[in-house]
A protein has these predicted regions:
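Conserved, mostly hydrophobic/aromatic
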Residues: 5, 24, 32, 61, ...
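Polysaccharide-binding and catalytic clefts of secreted carbohydrate-active enzymes
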Residues: 94, 98-300
Length: 633
């Protein structure tokens, strides 16, 4: 694993740069990301490039023995560009412009802005594409951050109409697919179709789903335009994009296919605070992050670009954007670094080198404080670098378990949750965590992935079944678990003929006759687990493998395939993992609370995420908080 940092030479006096570079090398860093927000300094006036400062910055880093990850600056179009084409900004769902004054103030569909992006990316690639310091390109920065995937601008509306025309061919085909006979929503031409916002009550869910598909395609094509330029002008240099955590607004598999390395921005403490975790979990893991947050995203993004992945921004201290922003427990920055290595990362880059004393992120910690003194994370980086040097490169081992993740499933359940607490990401994360708690390594894969090498397959939910998926499931010999709502919609957001699970009945013969959602706090009893949030009534000649206290079926099994007809709580997930692992011949480990295990091809890594010391039976020793054990396999 190569270690690096995010650096902004334009923020600091030029006479600091050489000393910064020297200190980076001394800390064990070898990569430096620069440039991703610097458009106004690269092109201060329209058509007038100021390359001098960037030339000198790159050369300074190069002389110090550092390699550069150069970002395209398209996440921050300068004021002069916004003033020249004010219609380039995104419009939010309420019809308000997403204006200048922060970042990501553009619409993916605006052709004029895309032209400007191609121009600036071409200029960068022509100047630096063959520079010996250049290790990697990063396209833009955090696509979709600040809720910017969806835009309801005129540019988006026009592009959406073209997208619909290409997809459906005729307005009547669109009307039929969407069911627009309902509420007299029929269109006579594609020109009549608007984005699905500013309606009196909810818009047609099929309209929403196509708008999300369209918006995702726009992100992918926007990225592809930059990738095509970089490949043409800088063909020997890898390309990445830095994705985010717990973010599903566009299909990351689609973008991942176009880059060489999928990277993501890891902020375990911020994510714990911002998402669904319970008060008890937020208290127990306040300074460590939930033990599966980082690992979940490592495994997700490893699957998004065919195996090559890394961390582009690693939290080094308190962040500035969560509801509360605690400091990491001493040792956690090193632990997060080594855990990324255990999951096969090619790089871990810390955000940022020096904490900014100004502007929006001045409360976000860095490896250095604003006065250039070392912050608490700096010695941990040196310690992690030493460990990485000792253990050497880590190849990723084939995981025994595949967990199927579909961005479209997140859109479907988000558009029509049918229950306030039905959250796709939480359902998937709970399944992942249940596997990890028993010491199992997991690959997170797209529905289109080849599943034949796995010994267990878990599909937390897959409302729309893609072509070929049933054949791949049926051809497996390993245990398969299908979660609630699987097969519940067609591609045009209809209830399938013959009811759910639609075409999945070819794999498991049952019919979902009714669904209901339960408010928080309502439970229905069962032996060893509880029915909460969501349940389905099932008609089948199969006898339930698992039932609730009233005898209502919860889990059905047909051969190697199971269907779970409720939101599975942790106790039920544990039961199912145990049964399926037994059938698959997989050894389980009952890991103590806060302990996680990950195996590379050559080493076994054990990490303690608990806030105190924990005795670890499989090691026969006690691990201190925020510590690890690494042993050859």
């Amino acid at each position: 694993v190569k270690l690096g940092c995010c650096y902004y030479p334009e923020h600091w006096p030029e006479d600091w740069w050489a000393e910064d570079a020297r200190r980076m090398r001394a800390m064990g860093l070898s990569l430096v990301r620069i440039g991703e927000f610097a458009w106004s300094r690269i092109e201060p006036e329209p058509g007038h490039y100021d390359w001098g400062w960037l030339d000198r910055a790159i050369e300074t880093l190069h002389v110090a023995g550092l390699k550069v990850i150069l970002g395209t600056p398209t996440a921050t179009p300068p004021k002069w560009l916004v003033d020249r084409m004010p219609e380039m900004v995104a419009i939010d769902e309420h019809g308000r412009p997403r204006g200048f004054g922060s970042r990501r103030h553009y619409c993916f569909s605006h052709e004029g802005y895309r032209t400007e992006c191609r121009r600036i990316v071409t200029a960068l690639a022509e100047r630096y594409g063959a520079h010996p310091a250049l290790a990697m390109w990063q396209t833009d920065n955090e696509y979709g951050c600040h809720d910017t995937v969806l835009s309801f601008s005129d540019a988006s509306a026009s592009a959406f109409r073209g997208w619909l025309s290409a997809r459906y061919g005729t307005p009547q085909a669109l009307n039929d697919a969407w069911g627009n006979v309902f509420w007299s929503m029929e269109y006579r031409s594609f020109a009549e179709v608007d984005p699905p916002h500013l309606t009196v009550t909810e818009a047609n869910p099929a309209h929403w789903l196509d708008y999300r598909r369209f918006a995702s395609d726009q992100v992918a094509s926007f990225n592809r335009e930059q990738v095509d330029i970089l490949r043409r002008l800088s063909p020997l240099v890898d390309i990445t994009h830095n994705f985010m955590g717990f973010f599903t607004e566009f299909d990351h598999h689609a973008v991942g296919r176009d880059v060489d390395v999928a990277t993501w921005d890891s902020y375990p403490l911020g994510f714990l605070e911002q998402f669904w975790f319970s008060r008890d979990e937020k208290a127990a893991y306040l300074r460590q992050g939930h033990p599966d947050i980082a690992a979940f995203h490592h495994d997700l993004y490893r699957g998004c670009s065919g195996g090559r992945w890394g961390v582009m921004e690693q939290q080094p201290g308190p962040v500035n954007w969560a509801r509360f922003n605690p400091a990491p427990l001493p040792g956690m920055v090193a632990l997060w670094t080594l855990e990324a290595c255990a999951h096969g990362a090619e790089l871990t880059s810390y955000f940022r080198w020096r904490q900014a004393p100004f502007a929006q992120e001045q409360m976000h910690a860095g490896l250095l404080r604003p006065d250039s003194s070392e912050a608490e994370a700096a010695p941990e980086v040196r310690a992690a670098a030493a460990v990485l040097s000792d253990i050497g490169p880590q190849a990723t081992a084939q995981a025994p378990v595949a967990l199927v993740f579909a961005y479209e499933a997140a859109w479907v359940t988000g558009i029509q949750p049918q229950g306030q607490s039905f959250r796709y990401l939480e359902l998937v994360f709970e399944a992942y965590s249940a596997l990890r708690q028993r010491g199992l390594d997991v690959d997170i894969v797209a529905p289109q992935a080849d599943l034949s090498a796995y010994r267990m397959v878990v599909v937390p939910t897959l409302p729309i079944i893609p072509e070929g998926f049933i054949e791949r499931l049926s051809g497996l010999a390993c245990p398969v678990l299908l979660g609630p709502r699987s097969g519940s919609k067609t591609a045009s957001f209809r209830i399938p003929e013959g009811l759910a699970p639609g075409t999945l009945r070819d794999a498991i013969p049952l019919t979902v006759t009714r669904v209901e959602s339960l408010r928080d706090g309502v439970t229905e009893p069962a032996e060893g687990f509880a029915v909460t949030r969501w349940r389905e009534d099932v008609a089948s000649d199969l006898s339930p493998e698992v039932a609730d206290a009233a005898g209502r079926g919860v889990v059905y099994r047909h051969g190697h395939i199971r269907y779970c007809a409720i939101w599975p709580d942790r106790a039920l997930l544990r039961l199912l993992v145990e049964r399926m692992a037994g059938e698959a011949g997989l050894d389980l480990i009952d890991l103590p609370e806060g302990i996680r295990l990950r195996r590379s091809a050559s080493h076994a890594f054990t990490f303690n995420y608990a806030s105190g010391p924990v005795f670890v039976p499989h090691l026969g020793e006690t691990l201190a908080p925020a510590s690890w054990h690494i042993a050859p396999r």
